[in-house]
């Protein structure tokens, strides 16, 4: 991208990447990544990868997607424990904060958490044969590691959804917010 010459292009150029802590698998095996430890003495392959990625560009970089799914199934395991699945929602929140801090510490131009709300249309190799493709968007599949990334979920209840996004907060009474 740096080699594209632009005239009268005030905004400039930037690079964007999807950077997840569990993929590519080399994050679990690359020696220098495994030797990268944070201030708490924990292995941090994510920040090592971010630093390496910066070497490919002289323009600003935005992490256009980063996240962790809370699916029951697991597609990739991370040496950091930041797995693609088998993570509870509290851990997901803590991991998102940590990944964003890594992005900031690496002096990236920004990061965008994936995703605001769960996407039910996603599928994965481990269960694609067990769903009906044209009906996939209509039901959540907790097994699918490409779902359950959302900060906001739309979980079905026994007879109705458990929470309506309609401005009436009475269905959330007694729920302690994560942040205010």
Provide a role label for each language-model segment.
Residues 1-6, 46, 90-102:
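Short, acidic/polar
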Residues 2-81:
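Glycoside hydrolase catalytic-domain groove-lining segments
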Residues 180:
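Surface-exposed, glycine/proline- and aromatic-rich loop segments on solvent-exposed faces
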Residues 78-81, 91, 102-107, 113-177:
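Aromatic-rich peripheral "rim/lid" segments of glycoside hydrolase catalytic domains that contact
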Residues 18-20, 66, 95, 112-116, ...:
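Broad hydrophobic/π-residue packing in well-ordered secondary structure
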Residues 10-12, 59, 95, 113, ...:
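Generic secretory/membrane-interface signal
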Residues 11, 107-108:
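Short loop/turn motifs at secondary-structure junctions
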Residues 37-38, 83-92:
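A short acidic, glycine-rich active-site loop
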């Amino acid at each position: 991208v740096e080699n594209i010459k632009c005239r009268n292009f005030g905004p400039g150029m930037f690079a964007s990447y999807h950077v997840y802590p569990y993929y590519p698998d080399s994050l679990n095996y690359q020696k220098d990544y495994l030797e990268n430890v944070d201030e708490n003495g924990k292995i941090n392959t994510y920040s090592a990868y971010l630093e390496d990625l910066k070497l490919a560009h002289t323009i600003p970089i935005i992490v256009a997607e980063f996240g962790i799914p809370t699916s029951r199934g697991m597609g990739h395991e991370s040496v950091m424990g930041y797995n693609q699945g088998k993570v509870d929602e509290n851990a997901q929140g803590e991991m998102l904060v940590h990944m964003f801090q890594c992005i900031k510490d690496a002096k990236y131009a920004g990061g965008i958490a994936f995703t605001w709300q769960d996407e039910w249309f996603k599928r994965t190799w481990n269960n694609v044969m067990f769903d009906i493709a044209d009906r996939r968007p209509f039901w959540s599949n907790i097994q699918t590691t490409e779902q359950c990334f959302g900060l906001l979920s739309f979980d079905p209840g026994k007879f109705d959804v458990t929470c309506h996004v309609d401005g009436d907060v009475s269905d959330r009474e007694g729920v302690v917010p994560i942040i205010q």
